Regions:
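Ligand-binding loop in jelly-roll beta-barrel domains
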Residues: 162, 166-176
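Single conserved hydrophobic/aromatic residue that forms the stacking wall/gate
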Residues: 1-7, 11-12
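Short, cationic low-complexity segments
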Residues: 29, 129, 197-204
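Signature of the catalytic double-stranded beta-helix
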Residues: 33-91, 95-98
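An acidic/histidine-cluster motif and surrounding catalytic segment
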Residues: 180
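Catalytic core of non-heme Fe(II) oxygenases with the double-stranded beta-helix
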Residues: 87-156, 173, 183-195
């Protein structure tokens, strides 16, 4: 996974609104449920105070699509779920992926320790676990990519990629805002691929 695909800096001039939203969206994580999803707090993107913040996220999504030479004018960028993650010392995120979206992101607010690991099966591997015998880890023989988080760092990746955090000694909370994005076609109905705009959907 190329670093240019997953990492970018995004500075917020006024972080006070982000902290105010966190005060409203925080939850009790003492029982191990460290993500807002487990508490029904998944609509942070509806907080009007954070509209400028999410517009900046959208710009980063468009840049992400542009990196792959995707015709970005074809798609609407839909924020479908966003939540805070609160990790106390000794708490980590297990291996998981986001099954309900196309693109996922995490924005680090307070970040002591705990690297994020993106994991994907390497198509170069000739047989199961072949790359457990490597002498040196390189871009073409590995199946993981480690990102050391830092404040105001935005990480974006395909939702289908498994990821987790590795524990590191720390004394403070790690707080981040994560989200899921679904791409829908803007106007086109002449293609097999891609989701049609939601206005064409119907329930019976």
């Amino acid at each position: 996974i190329d670093r240019s695909l997953v990492g970018s800096e995004m500075c917020i001039r006024d972080r006070s609104q982000l902290y105010k939203s966190f005060d409203d969206g925080k939850f009790d994580n003492s029982q191990g449920a460290i993500v807002g999803e487990h508490h029904g707090k998944v609509l942070i993107h509806h907080d009007k105070r954070l509209a400028p913040f999410f517009r900046e996220i959208k710009k980063s999504v468009v840049e992400y699509l542009d990196y792959f030479e995707i015709d970005k004018s074809t798609f609407n960028v839909n924020f479908v779920k966003t939540w805070f993650t609160i990790c106390d010392p000794q708490q980590t995120l297990p291996v998981h992926y986001h099954s309900c979206s196309h693109i996922s992101f995490v924005y680090y607010i307070q970040t002591p320790g705990d690297p994020l690991v993106l994991h994907k099966k390497n198509p170069n591997e000739w047989f199961g676990d072949a790359f457990k015998f490597i002498k040196e880890n390189r871009y073409n023989n590995g199946d993981g990519y480690v990102i050391q988080p830092k404040p105001e760092h935005l990480v974006m990746f395909p939702s289908s990629i498994e990821h987790y955090t590795t524990p590191e000694p720390r004394e403070h909370k790690r707080i981040s805002l994560a989200g899921d994005i679904v791409l829908t076609l803007k106007h086109r109905t002449d293609t097999e691929s891609g989701l049609l705009p939601s206005q064409y959907w119907k329930q019976f």
